[in-house]
Amino acid sequence: MARLVVVALLVLLCLSGLEAIQHAPKIQVYSRHPAENGKPNFLNCYVSGFHPSDIEVDLLKNGKKIEKVEHSDLSFSKDWSFYLLYYTEFTPNDKDEYACRVSDVTFTAPKTVKWDRNM
């Protein structure tokens, strides 16, 4: 019985320790298809490798939040880190700038990654 209690306490300690682990997210911004001015496309922001799961992701057009954005369900990898995909329809042109802004507990300030149409 004592052995069972010790094992249960060790399991609880290990599980509570998972919340203390923090991993900064990797942020990738890309379009679904190669960019062509005037041709509808999808802008994607893939955020991966982060822990804990509390995160805020915004897609931006010329520095302003895009309201009509969809996202995948929060999922986790084999290493228990999380990943998400945020996406929206957009039509690229030469004057507008697009980016993904991420707020996470591992950042002192939100991080913004610009979309590079040549990637």
UniProtKB/Swiss-Prot annotation:
Keywords: Disulfide bond, Immunity, Immunoglobulin domain, MHC I, Secreted, Signal
Superkingdom to which the source organism belongs: Eukaryota
Keyword field contains Secreted: yes
Residue intervals of the Ig-like C1-type domain: 25-114
SUPFAM superfamilies listed in its UniProt record: Immunoglobulin (SSF48726)
GO cellular component, one term: MHC class I protein complex
Keyword Lipoprotein: no
Subcellular location: Secreted
SMART domains per UniProt: IGc1 (SM00407)
UniProt-listed GO biological process terms: antigen processing and presentation of peptide antigen via MHC class I; immune response
Disulfide bond annotation, renumbered to this chain: 45-100
Protein's job: Component of the class I major histocompatibility complex (MHC). Involved in the presentation of peptide antigens to the immune system.
PANTHER family hit by this protein: BETA-2-MICROGLOBULIN, MHC CLASS II-RELATED
Subunit structure: Heterodimer of an alpha chain and a beta chain. Beta-2-microglobulin is the beta-chain of major histocompatibility complex class I molecules.
Family: Belongs to the beta-2-microglobulin family.
Protein name: Beta-2-microglobulin
Organism: Chiropotes satanas (Brown-bearded saki)
Chain's gene name: B2M
